[in-house]
């Protein structure tokens, strides 16, 4: 078993370095050997370089390296440098101490992979940006269960919304398994989930997502009224809905991605 795979060993390591888990960085260190192995298996095959965001104390980093991955680990918390240099000593890892949101993701090699226990507060903006780059073959990451549900939701469900459609536009999304708070140290207040995204190669479409954001901007309203409130001519929206065979009182959460794409075509040039 890894020396980082128990709360006791992690606590001892932190105390030895005079450190603590910092909530500012969303630090909840994964201490479950079983779940570490399952994450590595979900990320295989390692057909390109692997980028890990938020390596923390290096448990997942070590597991990936031992499985043969070529890893670049990006950590914002400079306090963890001596810890990572200790726990990953002798292993061929590239450590980068930088804010992951400022990393030049558009320049990573084509076919790269993301494998990470993501700091929860940056998960949504980071994943959205990585998908837009078109550089990744696969993204496998831990997030709050609630965020995973939003990424993989079906139409007509409470979790379905803009994030669901952004992810679906760029990738096939899978929620693989859930992790209890006890799999981490310190334990978070919520469950987590492992998500795997397999990009489809679809380019970014700003016009589509202006429409989607307008549609969900007034979630309690009908789609017709929400779009009218956002500046779309009501008559054009009514006409486009009729052309799609949709009733005038349809709501945004009833439309899947393909329906939004067709609606966007019907509203071309409307705003």
UniProtKB/Swiss-Prot annotation:
<keyword id="KW-0963">Cytoplasm</keyword>
<dbReference type="InterPro" id="IPR011530">
    <property type="entry name" value="rRNA_adenine_dimethylase"/>
</dbReference>
<dbReference type="InterPro" id="IPR029063">
    <property type="entry name" value="SAM-dependent_MTases_sf"/>
</dbReference>
<feature type="binding site">
    <location>
        <position position="117"/>
    </location>
    <ligand>
        <name>S-adenosyl-L-methionine</name>
    </ligand>
</feature>
<keyword id="KW-0694">RNA-binding</keyword>
<keyword id="KW-0808">Transferase</keyword>
<feature type="binding site">
    <location>
        <position position="54"/>
    </location>
    <ligand>
        <name>S-adenosyl-L-methionine</name>
    </ligand>
</feature>
<feature type="binding site">
    <location>
        <position position="75"/>
    </location>
    <ligand>
        <name>S-adenosyl-L-methionine</name>
    </ligand>
</feature>
<protein>
    <recommendedName>
        <fullName>Ribosomal RNA small subunit methyltransferase A</fullName>
        <ecNumber>2.1.1.182</ecNumber>
    </recommendedName>
</protein>
<dbReference type="InterPro" id="IPR023165">
    <property type="entry name" value="rRNA_Ade_diMease-like_C"/>
</dbReference>
<keyword id="KW-0949">S-adenosyl-L-methionine</keyword>
<dbReference type="GO" id="GO:0005829">
    <property type="term" value="C:cytosol"/>
</dbReference>
<dbReference type="InterPro" id="IPR001737">
    <property type="entry name" value="KsgA/Erm"/>
</dbReference>
<feature type="binding site">
    <location>
        <position position="30"/>
    </location>
    <ligand>
        <name>S-adenosyl-L-methionine</name>
    </ligand>
</feature>
<comment type="similarity">
    <text>Belongs to the class I-like SAM-binding methyltransferase superfamily. rRNA adenine N(6)-methyltransferase family. RsmA subfamily.</text>
</comment>
<comment type="function">
    <text>Specifically dimethylates two adjacent adenosines (A1518 and A1519) in the loop of a conserved hairpin near the 3'-end of 16S rRNA in the 30S particle. May play a critical role in biogenesis of 30S subunits.</text>
</comment>
<feature type="binding site">
    <location>
        <position position="28"/>
    </location>
    <ligand>
        <name>S-adenosyl-L-methionine</name>
    </ligand>
</feature>
<keyword id="KW-0698">rRNA processing</keyword>
<dbReference type="InterPro" id="IPR020596">
    <property type="entry name" value="rRNA_Ade_Mease_Trfase_CS"/>
</dbReference>
<dbReference type="GO" id="GO:0052908">
    <property type="term" value="F:16S rRNA (adenine(1518)-N(6)/adenine(1519)-N(6))-dimethyltransferase activity"/>
</dbReference>
<dbReference type="InterPro" id="IPR020598">
    <property type="entry name" value="rRNA_Ade_methylase_Trfase_N"/>
</dbReference>
<keyword id="KW-0489">Methyltransferase</keyword>
<dbReference type="Pfam" id="PF00398">
    <property type="entry name" value="RrnaAD"/>
</dbReference>
<dbReference type="GO" id="GO:0003723">
    <property type="term" value="F:RNA binding"/>
</dbReference>
<feature type="binding site">
    <location>
        <position position="99"/>
    </location>
    <ligand>
        <name>S-adenosyl-L-methionine</name>
    </ligand>
</feature>
């Amino acid at each position: 078993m890894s020396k980082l795979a128990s709360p006791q060993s992690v606590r001892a390591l932190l105390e030895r370095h005079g450190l603590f888990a910092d909530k500012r960085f969303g630090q909840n260190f994964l201490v479950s050997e079983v779940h570490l192995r399952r994450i590595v298996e979900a990320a295989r095959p390692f057909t390109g370089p692997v980028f890990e965001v938020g390596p923390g104390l290096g448990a997942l980093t070590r597991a990936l390296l031992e499985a043969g991955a070529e890893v670049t680990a990006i950590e914002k918390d400079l306090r963890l440098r001596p810890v990572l240099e200790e726990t990953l000593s002798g292993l061929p890892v590239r450590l980068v101490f930088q804010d992951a949101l400022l990393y030049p993701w558009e320049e990573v090699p084509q076919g790269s992979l993301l494998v990470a226990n993501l700091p929860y507060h940056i998960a949504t903006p980071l994943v959205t940006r990585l998908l837009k780059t078109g550089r990744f073959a696969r993204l496998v990451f831990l997030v709050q269960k609630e965020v995973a549900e939003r990424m993989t939701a079906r139409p007509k469900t409470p979790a379905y919304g803009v994030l669901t459609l952004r992810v679906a536009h760029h990738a096939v999304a899978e929620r693989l398994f859930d992790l209890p708070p006890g799999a981490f140290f310190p334990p978070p207040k919520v469950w987590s989930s492992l998500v795997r995204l397999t990009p489809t190669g679809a380019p970014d479409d700003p016009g589509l997502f202006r429409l989607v954001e307008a549609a969900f901007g007034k979630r309690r309203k009908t789609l017709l009224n929400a779009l009218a409130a956002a500046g779309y001519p009501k008559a054009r929206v009514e006409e486009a809905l009729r052309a799609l065979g949709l009733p005038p009182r349809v709501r945004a959460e009833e439309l899947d991605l393909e329906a939004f794409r067709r609606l966007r075509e019907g509203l071309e040039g409307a705003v």
